[in-house]
A protein has these predicted regions:
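Charged, solvent-exposed interaction patches on well-folded alpha/beta domains
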Residues: 3-27, 32-172
């Protein structure tokens, strides 16, 4: 906001362009929503909702990005996040349609979130999971195919419940 000359502190309330502030904040690839408004008491309120990455993609083709909880691509930053890293044969379509729901399912389960360090996608789109504990790799197979986004998420959740229940018994 300062760089664009619209920082509201020290500016008369009538000269503050709240719409422009909202538009500027919304342009950030890390902002999901931005709201800005003035009150009758002469205050300016700015509310920003951050996009939440669920998985980091480091594909063999050189792509490096995050996918958020709305299945949208986000650029990487200089900061690291404690997220699962997906490597291998990954294109953006597969990352947003299959790996993002898989990441959301894993991150929603406290044990899986702490157990799984990496997901590797093989050339036939089979999935391997690399746990934080031990020096082994777990092959879980291909994720279920579904055309509908909601059905796909439910199918991936059911698939992971079955696969990870077996693996969870091994670690308990």
């Amino acid at each position: 906001l300062q760089k664009n000359g619209i920082y509201p502190i020290g500016i008369e309330i009538c000269k503050i362009d709240t719409r422009r502030i909202e538009e500027m904040l919304s342009k950030s690839p890390f902002v999901q929503t931005a709201n800005c408004y003035k009150t009758e008491g002469g205050h300016v309120y700015i509310s920003v909702t951050q996009r939440m990455p669920v998985i980091r993609i480091k594909a063999e083709n050189g792509d490096d990005y995050y996918v958020d909880d709305n299945d949208c691509v986000m650029p990487t930053t200089h900061y690291t996040s404690d997220l699962i890293i997906a490597t291998g044969n990954i294109n953006r379509w597969y990352a947003t349609n299959y790996l993002s729901p898989l990441g959301r399912v894993i991150m929603a389960n406290e044990m899986w979130k702490n157990l799984i360090e990496q997901i590797n996608v093989l050339p036939n789109y089979s999935i391997e999971i690399v746990p934080r504990i031990g020096d082994h790799i777990v092959h879980i197979g291909r994720l279920p195919d579904c055309k509908n986004r909601t059905e796909r998420f439910a199918a991936i959740k059911k698939f992971m419940d079955v696969k990870m229940t077996r693996l969870s018994k091994f670690y308990k």
